[in-house]
């Protein structure tokens, strides 16, 4: 046997929740049981189990254990009553409370409970990118995303509130911007299942280590209905004055793609997955999410190439649902070989590729913050290009690859969209083909090449520096 070896435990230790090598065949069942328990309990996360060749080759049988008792691993399941009472007191005293919801609420599957809490407290809800969908995006109390590409109203709400009640949020730099100026008028309650996440980035007034759903249920149990009509009206006024908007450019309008997906999949139980880049932010801004429409993305990890393979996993895990992958032309090429997996597994995925011939998000930052010094972001660039390329366009060298031909090479089908008028009919046709033939499809949309994702707050800046 050809022997290959790498310290996979060392390589993955910093990116997995837990890693272990099984050295004894007799311990295999116990370790597998522990791995699944650790992965699913507390803050969910990946667990790697390394199986040496001799352990896999050794014959034998072992009964699968029914219980797990891991020394030193006791995920918190309760809610500290004293801290909870302090948090509720702040809610009752606040004139301008708001909820900041992160991905922890979605992981806890507490969307219904979160909606009830927002309605009972009568407070506006803003979300991180990972928290979007924790309350329906069409709910009147939902304001939008906070942070670098969040809405004006959501960021203004955080800037003006007197109580920020955060659940399942890490307060990363894309959310806070300049920490000294973040939520300057607010007391902060932070509920998170991971104690290390509390006060790590933002110092909070009331820390509560608890599962999101358990904490929300306790708050619902111990609070009376409240009203904040003037505050809600003020927040709604900001949203009306500074709504998200679309620019009309050549090619396909990127925001229109997302709104077309909302229309086409309105009556479908759908999982959307997103790659990383401008398209991810447009998806986070414009997708309508609720109990039957979910968005899966890699959040702060920022992994280009995430869209297609995560869609494969979503479709295998949820065969009864429609699954749509949203990618850019750069990110899609990082894992496009997974089309072969989707074809072989007969998965009816619809892959939407935003093709602007750019690594768009990096190019946007080069344009806005680096005096348009464009470097390695034009995907039409050829070695033979002359001089410094400042404004690549449709007359540049031929784009590589041809996504339609690539789909055909994988035994699938591709579609090419060059105008907004083609969007709805093409996506409907692609979905019908995918479902009828049990094959993935690619819908390549030629996006306006210089469209920017707005609003935007520069990294390390604050709300007062927002660009609309």
Give residue spans per PLM region:
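Short glycine/proline- and acidic residue-enriched helix-loop micro-motifs
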Residues: 13-19, 69-70, 236-250, 387-390
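Acidic, Ser/Thr-rich peripheral helices and adjacent loops at domain boundaries
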Residues: 364-397
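Glycine/aspartate-rich loop-and-adjacent alpha/beta segment that forms the canonical ThDP
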Residues: 55-78, 175, 405, 420-424, ...
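A general structural motif
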Residues: 3, 74-86, 146-150, 252-253, ...
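Active-site diphosphate/adenylate-binding microenvironment
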Residues: 236-314
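Thiamine diphosphate
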Residues: 153-172, 281-361
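Glycine-rich beta-alpha junction loops
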Residues: 51-57, 103-105, 195, 276-280, ...
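N-terminal alpha/beta PP-like core and its mobile active-site loop of ThDP/TPP-dependent enzymes
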Residues: 3-226, 260, 264, 348-351, ...
